[in-house]
């Protein structure tokens, strides 16, 4: 049996967090969630290589998504990160600034998120093999 890929989702908006968790569980991912940046960082630090991908909101209490991404990328540069934001008119610029691999502006289509997750995980596997 193939190992389930592990995804950490961090968002302070409970309906979004719940919907993302439900969707990704349905897609057979092993999902861990946090409701703020600090909680997400603690979960990441327990096992820095334990997550195949991280999805985080940008604007959150206790620790912003931008700060969280910076910390994670220093400790685990090959872990793909998707940032989600309600503020993003220019998601490409935000991706560069935040070091996220991809940025989605809310609202977004779950099918697009699913496609991006699969692309980023495939790319990560390819880098590991090279």
Specify the residue positions occupied by each region the protein language model found.
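Two-component/phosphorelay signaling modules centered on CheY-like receiver
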Residues: 14-32
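Receiver (REC) domain active-site loop signature in two-component systems and cognate sites
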Residues: 60
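Short amphipathic alpha-helix used as the core "switch/output" element in two-component signaling
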Residues: 42, 66-78
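Alpha4 helix (beta4-alpha4-beta5 surface) of REC/receiver domains from two-component response regulators
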Residues: 67, 87-104, 111, 115
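C-terminal output helix
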Residues: 108-119, 125
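Active-site residues of response regulator receiver
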Residues: 11, 57
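Acidic catalytic/metal-coordinating carboxylates
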Residues: 35-39, 64-67
